[in-house]
């Protein structure tokens, strides 16, 4: 994990927008990402016939979201991911489900959560990923959002977290994270 250095490009496209009138009750978006690993060839191990294409991985999601009230928003996203090169015992093609939400506690303060679960099993039972869970607090301003969260996954790429996560939130395997985003 620590030797993995990704270059990531992502796109998100709104297909449908929820309307206040209720004529369209949901929002639907497509999210896709392509990642290229920038680590050295030695990461692939001795005796491996290495090619550039082994560095590439993909994730695709259709995000179905709904704002139920001024306080509560939820989303669910079927997920397909593909890693061109995987360690022995893992599958290249994987599928999962993501769910997330936000509850506006008061003012610009919100509780947020995300849950991701890999639905297919790996070739080796010992390598099945643990579900991912993140619980957080967000403070929003006109131009920034500050997030502090506890999560049981440590990677920056969803496709690697889905497949390789071995941390169990219920066993105390969690990390503290912090994000700052700027709105333009």
Role assignments for model-derived ranges:
Residues 1-5, 15, 32-38, 80-84, ...:
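Transmembrane beta-strands of outer-membrane beta-barrel pores
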Residues 1-92, 161-171:
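Outer-membrane pore/translocation modules
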Residues 9, 26-30, 74-78, 109-113, ...:
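Transmembrane beta-strands of outer-membrane beta-barrel proteins
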Residues 9-13, 60-66, 99-103, 135-141, ...:
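Residues on the lipid-exposed face of transmembrane beta-strands in outer-membrane beta-barrel proteins
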Residues 53-55, 90-92, 121-132:
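Active-site glycine- and acidic-residue-rich loops that bind
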Residues 72, 76-119:
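A mid-sequence, solvent-exposed acidic-amphipathic segment
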Residues 124-184:
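Predominantly the C-terminal beta-signal and adjacent terminal strand-loop region
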